[in-house]
């Protein structure tokens, strides 16, 4: 074995979906196994769930894969409902979290959706970033060491509550307050 002295090591494994089985079955592949809202692949008798599943919307737009345990669980619930012929479950916005070097990072929704960024700083340090659509709906949130903000943002996103940029940016205004109730 070779030893290398280092004060810090960065391991960047990356996530590449294993799609060879799906590809050999003739399924549509593009950075994952392409599925519809019900988790059906291009072969309607085959479903795909979990990290390798990538949604294609009804209009053909490809969404990113959601590599998170909650997404895998929700994919299974959705596929089961489709197989049973019952209504598909209503699911919340996609969510993730990670702890890195003593920092807790969380995100919900999409920070890449069309719109503008609003930043909430505490003591001059940016802590929460929001993505707001042109029609003033919250569509994404990312936070450092503030899981309460992300949970509140998820509720706001899922309920399609119209938001105010100044209220989002103000750390003295609770995201659970009356400023953020459905109108």
What do the PLM-derived regions correspond to, one by one?
Residues 1, 13, 51, 108-113, ...:
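Short, positively charged
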Residues 2-78:
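FAD-site-proximal beta/loop scaffold in flavoenzymes
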Residues 26-27, 84, 158:
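A generic structural signal for secondary-structure junctions
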Residues 147-165:
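A short, polar/charged loop-to-alpha-helix boundary motif
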Residues 162-183:
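Cysteine/selenocysteine-centered motifs that mediate thiol-based redox chemistry or coordinate metal-sulfur cofactors
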């Amino acid at each position: 074995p070779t030893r290398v002295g280092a004060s810090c090591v960065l391991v960047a494994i990356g996530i590449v979906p294993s799609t060879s089985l799906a590809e050999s079955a003739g399924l549509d592949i593009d950075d994952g196994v392409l599925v519809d809202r019900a988790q059906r692949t291009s072969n309607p008798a085959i479903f795909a769930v979990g990290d390798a599943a990538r949604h294609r919307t009804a209009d053909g737009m490809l969404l990113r894969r959601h590599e998170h345990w909650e997404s895998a669980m929700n994919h299974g619930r959705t596929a089961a409902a489709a197989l049973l012929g019952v209504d598909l479950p209503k699911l919340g916005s996609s969510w993730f979290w990670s702890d890195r070097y003593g920092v807790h990072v969380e995100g919900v929704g999409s920070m890449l959706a069309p719109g503008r960024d609003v930043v909430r700083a505490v003591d001059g340090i940016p802590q929460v970033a929001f993505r707001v659509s042109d029609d003033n709906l919250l569509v994404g949130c990312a936070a450092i060491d503030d899981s309460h903000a992300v949970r509140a943002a998820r509720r706001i996103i899922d309920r399609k509550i119209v938001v105010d940029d100044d209220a989002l940016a103000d750390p003295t205004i609770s995201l659970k307050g009356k400023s953020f109730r459905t109108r």
